[in-house]
Amino acid sequence: MTTLSISRSQTLTAMAVRLGAFAVFVAILIYFAVQARGFLSPFNLINVVEQTTILGLLGFAMTVVFIGTGTDVQKGGIDLSIAANAGLSAAIYAVLLKNGHGDPVAALAAVGSGVVVGLLNGFAVVRLRIMPLLATLAVMNIAAGLELTVTENTVVGASSPLLALLTSGRFLGISSLAWCLILVSSLLVAVVHYSRTGLRLYAVGGQIEAARAAGINTGRYILGSYVFSGFVAGVTSILIVSRLSASTPGTSLLLLPILASALLGTV
């Protein structure tokens, strides 16, 4: 079998998986539309979008890592630390608010924490050349341990004007959380598909040697994908606190749903 045949086979397999996932989604949608009155009402659809905001944003971040590094377990990339990173950032945000710091300081600290974790992942993968699976697994354990240290393994309540806006704010009848998912996902799709950066990211993840031969700084794009993942985890941590009015242990349990949404979905 030629290289071209293998490439076509892999492409067809990937398309089949994605179309299959979409078909299942449509089937579930039709089932609930028939069985549950009001399921397709605007109020319920907006509520569904709001409920999936956190998972959706983290799933998009993981997808960017897959695009920029590939999905091969050994040669490709993955960010197993993304859920723990969001949990750590949420803990930092809630603790700072509880200690009297305002939204600007707490939010910057949360996002900064996420970016630092992303940088650590990227450094381990690009510079130290550690297998992404092992590198991000180690960082995941570090982030989870730091979260327990920061919160002392307790629920940390939080309230602020920003959290109130995210919780109860609405525009055109759509909640702030739903707008976060709509705007970020639209922007991400536009950047990944129609910008020079997005096309190069696809090139690096698809054929890294060819991308390197074309003069693309592959290490920079791989590092950037992990930093972006960390940035999104930091931003999403604020949304997590807004939904729960607290930072709670257990955010790392989102990892499997995030992986499923990234592997079966598409950007």
Q: Language-model segments: what does each one mean?
A:
Residues 128, 132-197, 221-224, 243-251:
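Transmembrane helix-bundle core of multi-pass membrane transporters
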Residues 60-66, 113-118, 184-186, 257-267:
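Hydrophobic alpha-helical transmembrane segments of polytopic membrane proteins
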Residues 102, 116-119, 173-247, 259:
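Helix-loop-helix "hairpin" substructures at the membrane interface of multi-pass membrane proteins
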Residues 1-59, 100-103:
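Membrane-interfacial amphipathic/re-entrant helices at transmembrane-helix boundaries
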Residues 31-36, 43-99, 128, 266-267:
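Single transmembrane alpha-helix segments in multi-pass membrane proteins
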